Amino acid sequence: MHSTIAYVFVSALALFAALHGSTSARNHTEDNSTEYYDYEEARCACPARHLNNTNGTVLKLLGCHYFCNGTLCTAPDGYPCYNLTAQQVRTLTTYPNTSCAVGVCMKGTCVKNGTMEQCFKTP
């Protein structure tokens, strides 16, 4: 009787393992795979500082690079940005006093799209 119960239990356990796989084997495969895990994206997972505007449109990055946990991160292509001079950046305040060139990030550069808007630091 005991051997029958043991046999049924072991068979059920084997069937479960076959259907669902071993947890340790599955985790091991996922941990070593770079196909599904973007390490660059993980290092750049903190929020980037954006500038506000008076138009009520989406907040935009100042340029296309930002630091996150000691890593220089690049915004993805097509991401909205402001293209400002160093002098404009130094004079930014928390109220709208700067006319900012609007653009989109392309390969790490904020490419102007010909429009301007008042931008300012978020409080």
Curated annotation (Swiss-Prot):
Glycans are attached at N27, N32, N52, N55, N69, N83, N97, N113. Residues 1-25 form the signal peptide. One of its GO terms (biological process) is negative regulation of chemokine activity. The keyword Metal-binding does not apply. GO terms for cellular component: extracellular region. It comes from the Eukaryota. Keywords: Disulfide bond, Glycoprotein, Secreted, Signal. Disulfide bonds join C46-C68, C64-C105, C81-C110, C100-C119. The keyword Acyltransferase does not apply. It is found in: Secreted. Its main location: secreted. GO terms for molecular function: C-C chemokine binding; chemokine binding. InterPro entries: EVA_Class_A. Salivary chemokine-binding protein which has chemokine-neutralizing activity and binds to host chemokines CCL1, CCL3, CCL3L1, CCL4, CCL4L1, CCL5, CCL7, CCL8, CCL13, CCL14, CCL15, CCL16, CCL17, CCL18, CCL19, CCL20, CCL21, CCL22, CCL23, CCL24, CCL27, XCL1, CX3CL1, CXCL1, CXCL2, CXCL4, CXCL5, CXCL6, CXCL7, CXCL9, CXCL12 and CXCL14. This is Evasin P1243. It comes from Amblyomma americanum (Lone star tick).
